[in-house]
C-alpha cells in the first residue's frame, strides 16, 4: 500500500518544521489509540448532563486520540513543538473537511481549559454537540485506519 497521497506537501512541511516526527514499532500502531478514543467518548457521553465542561474536554480528547491514531498508523506523531495544532493541520490536509469540527473542538476546549474572556463554561447542549462531533470523527477514523500505510 502506498502512502496517503492527499496532503503530502503539508505532512512534509510539518515534518520539516519538526511539528511531526516519524515513529516505528508499537508507536506506529493506531489501533490502540482508536480504542482509547472510543472509551473516552463513552465517558464523555456518560457525564454530559452532570458535568458539561468535562464532557466537552473529554469529547475533544476522544477526537484527538482518533486523529492521532490516523497519524500513528502512518508512522507519524505530533511533537511537543507541533502539539494539537499539528494534529489538526495534518488531518485536515490529508482527510479534508470531514475533520473540520476538530478545529472548533480544539479551540473551544482551549477556551474552557484556559479561560480569558467570553464564555468560559459549557452547557449540556454544547457538550452533547461536542460528543456528536467527536463521534463523527471517530467513525471516520474507524473507516480510514485500515487503509493507511507508512508515510515514507
Give the label of every model feature segment:
Residues 1-152:
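Terminal alpha-helical segments
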Amino acid at each position: 500500500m502506498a502512502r496517503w497521497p492527499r496532503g503530502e506537501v503539508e505532512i512534509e512541511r510539518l515534518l520539516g518544521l519538526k511539528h511531526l516526527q516519524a515513529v516505528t514499532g508499537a508507536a506506529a500502531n493506531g489501533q490502540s489509540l482508536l480504542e482509547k478514543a472510543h472509551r473516552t467518548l463513552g465517558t464523555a457521553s456518560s457525564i454530559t448532563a452532570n458535568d458539561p465542561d468535562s464532557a466537552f474536554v473529554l469529547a475533544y480528547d476522544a477526537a484527538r486520540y482518533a486523529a492521532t491514531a490516523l497519524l500513528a498508523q502512518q508512522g507519524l506523531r505530533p511533537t511537543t513543538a507541533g502539539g494539537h495544532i499539528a494534529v489538526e493541520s495534518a488531518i485536515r490536509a490529508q482527510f479534508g473537511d470531514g475533520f473540520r469540527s476538530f478545529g472548533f473542538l480544539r479551540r473551544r476546549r482551549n477556551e474552557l481549559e484556559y479561560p480569558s474572556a467570553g464564555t468560559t463554561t459549557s452547557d449540556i447542549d454544547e457538550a452533547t454537540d461536542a460528543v456528536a462531533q467527536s463521534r463523527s470523527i471517530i467513525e471516520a477514523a474507524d473507516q480510514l485506519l485500515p487503509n493507511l500505510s507508512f508515510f515514507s
